UniProtKB/Swiss-Prot annotation:
Keyword tRNA processing: no
Lipidation (S-diacylglycerol cysteine): 27
Function: Regulator of peptidoglycan synthesis that is essential for the function of penicillin-binding protein 1A (PBP1a).
Name this protein carries in UniProt: Penicillin-binding protein activator LpoA
Organism superkingdom: Bacteria
GO molecular function list: enzyme regulator activity
Lipid addition sites, N-palmitoyl cysteine: 27
InterPro entries registered for this protein in UniProt: LpoA, Peripla_BP_I, TPR-like_helical_dom_sf
Signal peptide from the UniProt entry: 1-26
Family: Belongs to the LpoA family.
Gene designation: lpoA
SUPFAM superfamilies with a match to the protein in the record: Periplasmic binding protein-like I
This protein's UniProt keywords: Cell outer membrane, Cell shape, Lipoprotein, Membrane, Palmitate, Peptidoglycan synthesis, Signal
Length: 603
């Protein structure tokens, strides 16, 4: 799953439209007479001018002018003068309104320098204070912004709910959107742990809706019925008045299963074997679907035996309402262009990812992408606490692609540079590894010292200590060579890096070399399969290799996604437990696969 890398945000940059509205409402022009001071208004003069007026006044009016001077000093970005004014006001007897404004300004000054916790501690309005409404609005808005900066979304939401009750109708819709966005930051596992107080009925309603959306997404009919019932029972709740778009989209969704499906694969030619395994997995899933419609049809088309025109004619004559495939990138693009020229776009799940995705084509994309797998590895290594990885990959175009994918994902989480080595000739492999870990440099330094001194040194070559994880893109035989080379290159008194590998190393065959301690990634079907599925597959295809199982799993997931994609497009964060991974979609409708991890030699 995608990991959120939180960053504290500056409160001034978080000025929401609602906050701006509150500020503007307090910006009424101050009277020309200096006898009347509205301390909730924005400063129109300089801090020095207000200070001169304060020095010419006394009592409450003097305090009012000091507060306006403090406001102006903060606006002028003069923290030193602001701090002096805060200290001066601290010695004065203040009315509740002055005390409230003083708290707001102290907190804002601290928030401006990202001292958020200290800012929060300044804000302690008393419930019995009789204050102008704008001060209560500013109080809740500032607390909401500070909580947001502290990544405390639920506390921020609590403040926004309080602000909602004090706001004008023109601000309420934007506030409702902000409340909903805050709650959507939470995952299903975290949101169910949140709770409200007995007197927080409005917040509790928002929370309940968010929990429904996060936990019932896998059963869309139940989610739809639950939402409809809740909204009918709570017609005056802000969520019923300003219903979030994510909810209205679900309420408007008509759940329709495809009736006539076409499976487009190159069943002859270069990729015939791969296509046949995908077909087998698709049909296997279809035959195991207890909810399959009795009138459902499947048309399998060999894309190498038909022209584009004849494929289109078959789709039309068979009244196809969903297409799975093609498998070849070029065929995907050609079919999309042909359908667009005809103005007939059939919902499609392509079984590859084109280099350039046409977002107007309305298609989704599923593939066993090596780039997706190594990107997952980069994320996994970081979440496991590793900070200085090395990636070893073949010295070819494939190796360069996966290294680029690993680097791109790693940069999302860390500024540390990834060490990279591409291996080619296996005879050079040990030399490459020694070079990576600095062993050759260490040996050369020792030789130079011995030459200079004219005598032998009792010393041991030292390996570099910064690499804490090695991700190896290699098949099983390559991994059996690489692992001992790494072990030899590491000094006995140093902590060895953790070794990881991709799914190519998991052949499913007998391992004649010790690969224990190497953690590898692969699809769930090969790491933790459902017992019933594993038993059926073994009975039907007892001789299938792991590579063939992955293709069958791709076909199985393609069938499942036919039904699930409409929900996935609408329900934010919607995932399904597939055979090739935990499946979700991105903004281009490319299916993302969260793969599984296991250790070689552990069953």
């Amino acid at each position: 799953m995608a990991m959120n890398h939180h960053q504290r945000r500056s409160v001034p940059r978080l000025l929401t439209p609602i906050a701006l509205s509150i500020v503007l409402s307090a910006c009424s022009t101050q009277p020309s007479s200096p006898d009347v001071v509205d301390i909730t208004a924005q400063p129109l003069l300089t801090a020095q001018t207000y200070l001169m007026r304060a020095d010419a006044s006394q009592g409450n009016q003097q305090n009012d002018w000091l507060i306006m001077a403090l406001k102006a000093a903060i606006e002028e970005n003069n923290p030193d003068q602001a701090q002096l004014l805060i200290m001066r006001l601290a010695k004065q007897p203040l009315t509740p309104t002055q005390q409230a404004q003083w708290q707001l300004l102290r907190a804002q000054l601290l928030a401006n320098t990202e001292q958020y916790q200290e800012a929060l501690e300044q804000l302690s309005f008393q419930a019995n204070w009789s204050l102008p409404q704008v001060q209560w609005q500013q109080y809740h808005q500032l607390r909401a912004d500070i909580f947001t900066a502290l990544d405390r979304s639920f506390d921020s939401t609590r403040e926004l709910v309080a602000l909602y009750g004090l706001s004008s109708n023109k601000d309420k819709e934007a506030l409702a959107d902000q409340i909903w966005a805050n709650l959507n930051h939470y995952s299903a596992s975290k949101i169910i742990k949140l709770s409200t107080e007995p007197d927080e009925a409005q917040l509790d309603g928002w929370l309940q809706l968010a929990i429904y959306m996060k936990t019932l997404g896998s059963d869309l009919p139940q989610l739809k019925n639950t939402l409809e019932k809740w909204l009918a029972e709570n017609p005056q709740h802000p969520a019923a008045i300003y219903t979030p778009k994510a909810i209205t989209d679900i309420l408007a969704l008509e759940i329709v299963k495809p009736t006539n499906t076409a499976l487009l694969l190159p069943l002859t030619g270069k990729f015939a074997k791969q296509a046949q395994f995908i077909r087998d997995g698709f049909v296997f899933a279809m035959m195991n679907d207890a909810d399959r419609q009795t009138n459902a049809t499947l048309t399998i088309i060999d894309t190498n035996a038909e022209t584009l025109e004849s494929v289109d004619a078959i789709l039309t004559s068979k009244q196809i309402d969903f297409v799975v495939g093609p498998l070849i990138k070029g065929n995907i693009e050609k079919l999309q262009q042909f359908q667009q020229s005809r103005g007939q776009m059939i919902p499609t799940l392509a079984l590859n990812i084109p280099d350039q995705i046409d977002t107007t084509a309305g298609a989704c994309y599923l593939a066993l992408s090596p780039e997706q797998e190594v990107a997952q590895a980069a994320k996994h290594l970081f979440t496991q606490g590793y900070r200085y990885p090395l990636i070893l990959a073949p010295q070819n175009a494939y190796g360069e692609r996966v290294v680029e994918a690993f680097n791109e994902e790693w940069r999302r989480y860390s500024k540390n540079k990834v060490a990279v080595n591409l291996f080619g000739d296996k005879r050079q492999l040990q030399r490459n590894i020694n070079s990576i870990f600095g062993l050759q440099d260490s040996q050369q330094n020792i030789a130079q010292m011995e030459s200079l001194l004219g005598m032998g040194l009792e010393s041991q070559p030292r390996s570099r200590r910064d690499i804490d994880a090695v991700y190896i893109v290699a098949n099983s035989s390559e991994l059996t060579l690489i692992k001992p080379f790494i072990e030899v290159a590491i000094n006995p008194d140093t902590r060895p890096p953790k070794l990881f590998s991709n799914s190519n190393s998991n052949t499913g065959g007998r391992q004649y070399e010790d690969l224990s301690g190497v953690t590898y990634s692969d699809i769930p079907l090969l790491i933790q399969p459902a017992p019933s599925i594993k038993e059926q597959l073994t009975q039907i295809w007892p001789e299938s290799s792991n590579a063939e199982r992955r293709l069958q799993a791709l076909g199985m997931d393609a069938y499942r996604l036919m039904v699930e994609l409409p929900q996935m497009k609408i329900v934010e964060g919607y995932t399904i437990d597939g055979q090739t991974g935990v499946l979700s979609i991105d903004e281009q409708c490319v299916v993302q696969r969260e793969i599984s991890w296991a250790e070689h030699g552990v069953r």
